[in-house]
Amino acid sequence: MRSTMKMDKKNIKHWTVCLAVVLSAFTATAVNAAVSISDAEKLKSSLTPLGAQREGNGRDIPAWRGGLSMPPLEYKKPGQHHVDPFPQDKPLFTISAANMLQYQKYLTEGQKELFRTYPDTFRMPIYRTRRTAAAPEWVYENTYKNAIRAELSSDGNSLLYAYGGIPFPVLDDSSQAGIQALWNHITRWRGTFLQLQASEVAVHKDGNFSPTTVEQQVEFNYYRPDKTIEDLNNTLFYYLSVTKAPARLAGGAVLVHEPLNQANDARQAWGYNAGQRRVRRAPNLAYDTPIAAADGLRYADDTDMYNGSPDRYNWRLVEKREVYIPYNNYRLTSNKLSYNDILRPGHVNPEYTRYEKHRVWVVEGTLRDNVRHVYSKRVFYLDEDTWNISVADQYDMNGELWRVSMAYIKTYYELPVTWSGMDVFHDLQARRYHTQGMTNEEPEDIDYSNPPPGDRYFTPAELRRRGRR
């Protein structure tokens, strides 16, 4: 009995020490967390679960009421081309070069320049705003947890203690708010595993084009429901792409392992050359490395509007404002249209585009001293409901507006996830553009229905095997 009492005292002392360590660690985390618990609670009241302002503007931006999370009855199976849930919607008005000044308050500098560059043909049909953004409940729950635990490294280049949701849904008032917003884009919800066959197209000045068709598989390790922060192994996603056409490029393949902490681990990339039948490391597939299929119109970190390490720019949060951005673009991505219907000289056919007024976060990046990149400045407009970069204005080394990118967003209601259905990269100086993610002429759209194959699938050996098929 006496010896038991001695053991109990030892145990009490042991657990007291352990509890003190745990509490001190929790306190340190809370002090350094993005927001307080009371601020995080706003995600359940005045803010949406992903951090947007829940209420409307009292005029033409409605309140968010849960988004679009149920497919129309006509949508029957995974991978099916999306049925437009709003076929009855018509443009409220159309912005053109002739009336641009009337609406300039709600346009980005890049959009204004597109009107000036193509005054006779570029237009923006403005539709009723529908806040269709939605995500699964478990993503909302993880976003709440991230709000009170996620941190950035002191230089902002690494994300810590986040998993399975937006890391910074409530931006703080520090100098890191801009890079927090950028990390929200980098890690935003895009599904867990997807398979896609799509075309990317470089469109010449005269409108001629030749599609490059690729088959892609992406596993977003950060969004594996069966994972924890400890299980991520510093991996944001795995990406495997195999070129199917044209014949001169067919069989070429790329594999990417994308890290979360890019300060400690650089992106790992491999390329398979079908002609040589060899897999090689591709150490430079980042920053402003040109993408071969884009004919010089897209660089590595242009993909997905922005990706990769943020370390070459100083980022600042400029403001939140209302902007006309591409949204709910079901018609543009419909399989009822051919690429010939869509691709025109200078820009995509505006007859099939849809723009709506949404609130966006404006984030500006200026090139740091003693580093190189073709863009001296980048201005991103992030949709507040999803953290997607919807428009990107990018400047050359002379400070001139050079390139304008737009993501034609829609909600994949079968999951749900709100993401781009097609990205367009405009070179204003060359008067050319490049598109990525076109599926109009493919048998299917993105298929989210299969379980993730796991990290053992995304290997150089698999890259070689897939390239040979």
Q: What are these regions, as identified by a protein language model?
A:
Residues 441-469:
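Long, C-terminal catalytic modules of enzymes
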Residues 18-27:
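Bacterial N-terminal signal peptides
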Residues 197-245, 303-380, 390:
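Extended beta-strand-rich segments in extracellular/periplasmic secretory proteins, especially
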Residues 3-19:
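Bacterial N-terminal signal peptides that target proteins for export
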Residues 37, 42-266, 273:
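Solvent-exposed N-terminal domain segments of exported/luminal and surface proteins
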Residues 27-34:
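Sec/Tat signal peptide C-region and signal peptidase I cleavage site
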Residues 34-35, 40-68, 95, 108, ...:
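Gly/Pro-enriched, hydrophobic low-complexity segments
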